[in-house]
Amino acid sequence: MTKKDIRVVNIVVSSSLGQDIPLEKMAATLSNTEYNPEQFPGLVIRIKEPKTSALIFNSGKIVCTGARDLDEVQRSIKQIIKSLEKINIKITIEPKVTIQNIVASGAVGMDLNLNVLAMKLQNTEYEPEQFPGLVYKINVEPKGEKVLKATFLLFSNGKVVCTGTKSEHQVHQALDALIENLKKVK
């Protein structure tokens, strides 16, 4: 019997600070930043607590990664705003956060024969010489909701990584669908 076990390990969000940000000034003043505009137009800011990183662009757009829940996301955005206040940039809006991707890891509670799954499941990629996991793209059609697309990495020991969802609820819907599909293969 399968035992469902999964937890969120990373949330990627986007947001906007609602104004242009002087990245050169941030990079020159704040020690927890990296900025090399010849290589990439965004500034990287690393936040110690919660342990997250964000890309900040001149336009004020932000992409934040590393948070494990929405509370950590909000705390990270607040830390960025505090950092900006240190260089006399006042953010007057409450930034609206949009989840772009959630990564979750866990286990299905049983060993998996990846060779069999690669042959019997649709939308799989399995190249054991290059990577020990099987990539499985799944479409879930919850009643009354739009189609949910998720991608799983499946490992022979039953461990899984799920990506492509936008809520914890979707993670669980995708995992339930995965387990149903795995049961059909046996």
Language model regions located:
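Intrinsically disordered, low-complexity polar/charged tails and linkers
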Residues: 1-159, 165-186
